[in-house]
């Protein structure tokens, strides 16, 4: 990132670059994706408990959020402070990283339910070799790339990087709300059908 200091005006882009880099790393921390498939042949144990499908799915999502979201936010905070971002940029970098972690968990739950494989031989299959995991990683990467392309080609003349980060946080929050709604409705029905 020191290279960008040599280009006039590029220091304003550092928060966007930090969010993109951390977002790509967050996309590889899909803890919620294999959580459905890892139940395997013992899924009947969870289904026999007096818990609704929504409670089970929320618990799996909470585990992902407990591990990924705080670490993502702290990483965003440390990097934003280390690179001398403005206070507003620090806030939006931290929020963006947290929302990307949440989006990763929600997208992982949806993909994990859609492409659940309960007939695996070793735990490596759902954790490292599943279609759900690939679609989750590629989906979050696509969101990050689409955000970068949106700013670079359409909104760069209209918005400052800080304003775009605020808009991107809003878009991420809306995506999270939509995916959460899908998880507790469609996802609960899909869980019952497994």
Which residues does each predicted region cover?
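Hydrophobic alpha-helical transmembrane segments of membrane proteins
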Residues: 1-44, 52-194
């Amino acid at each position: 990132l020191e290279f960008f200091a040599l280009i006039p005006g590029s220091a304003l882009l550092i928060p966007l670059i930090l969010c993109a880099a951390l977002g790509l790393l967050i996309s590889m921390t899909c803890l919620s994706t294999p959580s459905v498939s890892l139940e395997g042949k013992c899924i009947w144990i969870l289904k026999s408990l007096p818990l609704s499908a929504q409670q089970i799915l929320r618990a799996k999502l909470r585990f992902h959020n407990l591990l990924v979201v705080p670490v993502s936010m702290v990483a965003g905070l440390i990097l934003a402070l280390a690179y001398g971002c403005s206070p507003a940029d620090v806030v939006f970098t931290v929020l963006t990283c947290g929302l990307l972690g949440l989006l990763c968990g929600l997208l992982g739950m949806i993909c994990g339910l859609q492409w659940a494989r309960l007939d695996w031989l070793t735990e490596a299959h759902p954790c490292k070799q599943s279609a759900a995991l690939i679609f989750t990683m590629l989906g979050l990467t696509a969101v990050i790339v689409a955000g970068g392309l949106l700013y670079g080609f359409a909104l760069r003349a209209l918005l400052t990087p800080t304003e775009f980060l605020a808009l991107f946080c809003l878009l991420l929050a809306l995506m999270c709300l939509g995916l959460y709604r899908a998880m507790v409705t469609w996802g609960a029905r899909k869980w019952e059908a497994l």
